[in-house]
Amino acid sequence: MAQDGRKSGGARFFSYFEGRKTREGVPTPHLMEELSSRKRDVPRWSQAFGPLGFTLVMVAMGAGSIYFGATVAGVLFCLIGVVPVAAVTLLVARALPRVFGAQRGGGEEELGPYLGGGGDGRVRAMCPGLFEQEREKIEWNRAEEADRTWRWLQALPCGVERVETTSDDGCRLVGRAIACRPESRRWLVFAHGYADNWRAGLTYARRYAELGCNLLLVDLRAHGESEGDWVGAGWLDRRDLVAWCRWVADRAGEDARVVLAGISMGAASAIMACGEDDLPEQVRACVADCAYDDFWDTAVGVVSSGSLGTPPMPAHPVLDIARLLLRLRRGGYDVASAKPLDAIARSGAPVLLVQGEDDRVVPAHMADALAAAAGGAAAGEGHELVKVPSAGHCCAVFADPDLYWEVVGAFVGAHS
């Protein structure tokens, strides 16, 4: 059952099956209710310097104790002040390059992380809250698409061309162009998620080609073959995607019609790119699948809940220290700047938000927040939201491919 309504600013939103309350006939609350009710976390630099203040106070107390003759107590105060903070800082510093540093793996699967041989494991990791029957349906659809995509690739009338461009800061970026629709002026620019590469776009390539799109599947900076020392969290990537859209406009001409799409971090990057003042006018539409609305708030939720399979841990001061260290590194930046919630109100193209209802990485309420931000701004007509039941992170396309491509096809057709 579809629900259709109007938001202020003229933007249209709709959500399919919003009234679903049961799974296999058993009443179940939304898996993400506890996160949707969590107060949004606001980054503060004071949180990063808090541990330093604690250390200084304890060392001062220790020095005072030693001065007045309480040597043992003074040493204990100093140890309590220095050791825990130093240990946490050291652990974060060692983990920082592993988490935010260049992610060069993920290229061994010819069909990418979702359609390749390890795709079943990836889907299960992304859909931990689903019943077995629901995961089996997703796996069936995934395997079916893998087979069809393989046959489609073998029959391509063109090759897969390695292409390059350069971002504003001189970072060399690499992608793969598939000009499978030479008669069409429509191009897809696709951005993958964290720790993946251009092959993640193969999950969607065949169906976008059927919609008349030539394809540009990019390696985000610090991923695949693209240069970059640090993962951009969407903030650095927004400028890279503007550069890629400009590349398409130069190649395909002024009458090119570009669809900018992405999943997860790539979706957030696409939204923020659409908010840039110099976005090429050829960009006619944006499809953002499971985009977070605020990277910092998402990271706090993931770290504190362990929703990616890691042990839950206190987000503060771990993330605060990581934020400070990354900002101080050469080529680093402030990860808290990555906030699609602010950018979507300035979008120069209509945005289709696709969201899995059972996403434990990017909770569904984030799509609602993005929809509200877009609908409340004078960003023009055409923004849409679709929620897909029984879909975990990046798995809406497998949970209900008919619904997914019905909505995406209509959106792409209407705006490009």
State each model region's role.
Residues A336, R360-M366:
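Conserved alpha/beta-hydrolase "acid-adjacent" motif
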Residues M272-Y333, D342-A343:
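Hydrolase active-site cap/lid region
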Residues V231-A252:
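Alpha/beta-hydrolase active-site loop
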Residues A391-W405:
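Catalytic histidine-centered segment of alpha/beta-hydrolase-like enzymes
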Residues R346-G348, L353-Q355, D359:
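Short beta-strand/loop motif that positions the catalytic acidic residue
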Residues G9-R44, I80-T165:
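An N-terminal hydrophobic leader/cap segment in hydrolases
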Residues A205-E227:
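Conserved alpha/beta-hydrolase
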Residues D358-V362, C394-C395:
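Acidic catalytic loop of the alpha/beta-hydrolase fold
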